[in-house]
Amino acid sequence: MNALTAVQNNAVDSGQDYSGFTLIPSAQSPRLLELTFTEQTTNRFLEQVAEWPVQALEYKSFLRFRVGKILDDLCANQLQPLLLKTLLNRAEGALLINAVGIDDVAQADEMVKLATAVAHLIGRSNFDAMSGQYYARFVVKNVDNSDSYLRQPHRVMELHNDGTYVEEITDYVLMMKIDEQNMQGGNSLLLHLDDWEHLDHFFRHPLARRPMRFAAPPSKNVSKDVFHPVFDVDQQGRPVMRYIDQFVQPKDFEEGVWLSELSDAIETSKGILSVPVPVGKFLLINNLFWLHGRDRFTPHPDLRRELMRQRGYFAYATHHYQTHQ
């Protein structure tokens, strides 16, 4: 099942009291909610998962769901339904999550455990070919010689969807800040499709549904090209996207010009959010109607940022939802 899903309109009011965490609208947009685990929840979670090092989560995939259940139980089983309803709700679909007391690179393993628990309450994180694990950790430094914009600090990483060059469904993306030193700038950039003023123009274009070729550079460790259109629809006919400017390969002049105009229209949108993500926090978004990117950094010889990502598919009890296949 995937994100092309209609959910019954019974989302929990963000003003409701929850057990083990708080939930409020973010300062940037009511579409983006901030979820904070209390100090007690954080400490009890870390105590109960201490017996499993990160390597155990890597080797035994069922443990990723076990730590998710532990976290949900600590939240009186209110967390899992809240996560699903928020991420599947077209009006929201995004969370900024943190746990009180997890805010230092020395706690990197604890960060991976927490993010893994949250992700596996909504689905399962896909194999990441770049890292060879279900998650990837990577570092941005002042000088970069890589073959994509992922680690390049002094330019904007344009807005995009993840999973465009793989065959696996990528319903959600999780991006966590593990470390940051000598950093200015570099906020996360987000754009909800319904806030993009040029959506209707490009969605109705004849090329919007034409399958196009997506090919990744060598660092991604993916050798097979995939073909799919830039736009699709959910069960209610609303637009969703699978797009990244770096990896789409236009076959002719017509496609190249249209993709260039599409990129310009996205990057100049007035609906873009700039979201600071402190160390220990992570963004969790619906990948099919949110685009994400990163603003540029101010140069510094000792600039360093370490990130962790997970991306995967939604999985839940089907009798509560109608799923577009």
UniProtKB/Swiss-Prot annotation:
Coiled coil: none annotated. It catalyses: glutarate + 2-oxoglutarate + O2 = (S)-2-hydroxyglutarate + succinate + CO2. Disulfide bonds: none annotated. Fe cation binds at residues 160, 162, 292. InterPro entries: GlaH, TauD-like_sf. Binds 1 Fe(2+) ion per subunit. Transmembrane segments: none annotated. The keyword Iron applies. Pathway: Amino-acid degradation. It comes from the Bacteria. This is Glutarate 2-hydroxylase. It comes from Escherichia coli O1:K1 / APEC.
